[in-house]
């Protein structure tokens, strides 16, 4: 238990230090429709000076996974489109559901999408309670149990084959409403191009006002 606590303390410390550099990602975030204020709410940061063990993530956007007990994981996204891999995780870390705090904040329904930036776009830019998984292939059985009490689960399907397969597989397990993005689009790119009402229209929410 002590080892787990010290690991959490290190993750919290790293998150705080990386947050101080978020201004370095301002142009990138603006291109994704994410303001610095929203980035701060999500506790995003930049690895300007790497903490011990994070040397391989230098220059990347840091994305903390936050639960009621604090920061439990960090993932890192390249700010340079030419640099692969686009996303990197902590060595030996298992994939986790992102933004789980929204499960308690949500009412009768919740959204699910791929990727942390899509989740931030829905949850903090548009105001749609939402959780995310880092890729279509990382869904786990216990995620289904976490969402089993919702009357409706909006699954935001990226406009590619893996996205469609992700939505279809969830529809076998949960009361799903599939919200399909256009070909080659995802939640974030659709929001940047067309705005929040476009997403809400696709969900049918604007009709319910």
PLM features: residue spans?
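Short, aromatic/basic amphipathic alpha-helical patches
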Residues: 165-174
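TOPRIM metal-binding catalytic domain and adjacent DNA-binding surface shared by DnaG-type primases
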Residues: 1-62, 67-68, 104-105, 203-209
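Phosphate-handling DNA/RNA-contact segment within nucleic-acid enzymes
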Residues: 49-152, 166-167
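Short, acidic/turn-prone active-site loops that include or flank metal/cofactor-
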Residues: 133-139, 158-161, 181-184
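Acidic beta-strand-to-loop metal/phosphate-binding motif
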Residues: 112, 150-162, 180
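Switch/connector loops and helix/strand junctions flanking conserved nucleotide-binding motifs
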Residues: 163-165, 189
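Short, surface-exposed amphipathic charged segments that create phosphate/polyanion-binding patches used
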Residues: 60, 145-150, 186-200
């Amino acid at each position: 238990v002590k080892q787990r606590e010290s690991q959490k303390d290190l993750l919290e410390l790293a998150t705080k230090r990386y947050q101080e550099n978020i201004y370095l990602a301002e142009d990138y975030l603006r291109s994704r429709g994410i303001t610095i204020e929203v980035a701060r709410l999500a506790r995003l940061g930049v690895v300007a000076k790497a903490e011990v063990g994070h040397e391989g993530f230098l220059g990347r956007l840091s994305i903390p996974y936050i639960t009621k007990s604090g920061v439990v994981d960090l993932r890192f996204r390249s700010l340079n489109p030419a640099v692969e891999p686009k996303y990197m995780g902590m060595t030996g870390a298992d994939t986790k559901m992102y933004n789980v705090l929204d499960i308690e904040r949500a009412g009768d329904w919740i959204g699910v999408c791929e990727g942390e930036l899509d989740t931030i776009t829905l949850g903090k830019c548009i105001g749609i309670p939402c959780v995310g998984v880092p890729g279509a292939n990382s869904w786990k059985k216990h995620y289904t149990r976490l969402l089993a009490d919702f009357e409706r689960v909006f699954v935001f399907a990226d406009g590619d084959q893996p996205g469609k397969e992700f939505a279809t597989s969830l529809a076998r397990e949960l009361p799903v409403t599939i919200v399909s993005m256009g070909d080659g689009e995802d939640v974030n790119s659709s929001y940047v191009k067309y705005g929040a009402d476009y997403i809400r229209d696709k969900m049918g929410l604007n009709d319910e006002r």
